[in-house]
Amino acid sequence: MNIVITVTNKEVPVALSLRTCVRTAAATAAAAMLALTTACSAGLGGPASSRTAQDGVIRFTFAPDPIWDYMHDTGIVDQWQRDTGYSIETSATWDEFGLFAGGHADIISTASFEVPGLEEQTQRETVIIGRYNAERSRIMVRADDTAQSLADLRGRRLGVFTTVSGTLVWSALVAQMHDMKVLDGDFDIVVADIQNLSNLLARGEIDACICYPDLSARELRDGSVRPLYDGKSSADLFAELNAPGHDGPMGNVFVARKDWVDGHPGEVSAFLDLWDRGLAEWQEHRDEMIERYPQHFAVATPEDIAFMKAYVAEHDWVTDEVRFDEQWAEDESSIFDLMRTTGVISDDITDPQFLPTEGVQP
């Protein structure tokens, strides 16, 4: 496998988008241990918490997120605290794993397929309590490229922002669909800044990329790049091939310490209620959120904001409900079956634990 790391000095005038930042070195170390750790999460304001757990208080660590910002700025969070009697303490950090490991967070958000890496790094037993958004990366090529799938790109330059994260999911899918290995010789892997991948593609410095659409708005809008597989994300293809009707694998789920969950069922239920409200607000005020918080979608110009509104309306990766049932958990776990079967992860990597609460009251 040839891996090239590209460093660019090109300025990008917008912040990282909704849940697509690259994790810090701590998370990268966990990924190296398990070949399973990913990109990022979403979050909030406030200083990093050093407080200990206490009843009635939910310590939630997240990275910047438009739905949370909207709920905070419109008073929904304050009203929820008054109505429930619970309080939520938030910590703004890209090192969710670090706070979690130190015992300073009860709930964080990460990809479902990151959870084994989280447990390995933090040495804490966890449980997935809610779902948030699907893994949304796409395979993109230049608009004038004749390739119809990655099978047509053997030996060419594939840009990725990490060799873990969504690359793991695509590695399993490509092995299943084309009997090819993404990270073992079938492509020249170019590791580059996540925000510059689609620009590198448009300029001809790479031949394809595993890209996020919300970080590719300008190139998608001007028609210089196009997605393969009919524009389907990794989650779309996974569901189509392995779990019909499923909405994952998840780019972000809500993960909590199992000992905390076992002792705080009321807090867990109230937290999920708050996020169900957030998901409902997203469905009703999606365009407004994109306008109010364009930095979370990596857009800045009116043209790119308008494009992102239209794109998300057609390809919304946010789930309709935060709670899930046993069948959903089983379908979500099947990504690990596929990864093990295709040799992307080792056979000793265990599935994460899930807490199905759809229709269940505390």
Predicted regions and their residues:
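Short, glycine-/small- and polar/acidic-enriched structural segments
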Residues: 46-191, 207, 224
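Conserved C-terminal helix/tail region of periplasmic/extracytoplasmic solute-binding proteins
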Residues: 329-362
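Bacterial signal peptide processing site
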Residues: 41-44
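C-terminal motif of bacterial Sec signal peptides marking the signal peptidase cleavage site
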Residues: 36-39
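Secondary-structure end/capping motifs
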Residues: 261-342
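Short, solvent-exposed loop/beta-turn-alpha elements that line the ligand-binding surface or hinge
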Residues: 78-85, 233-247, 315-327
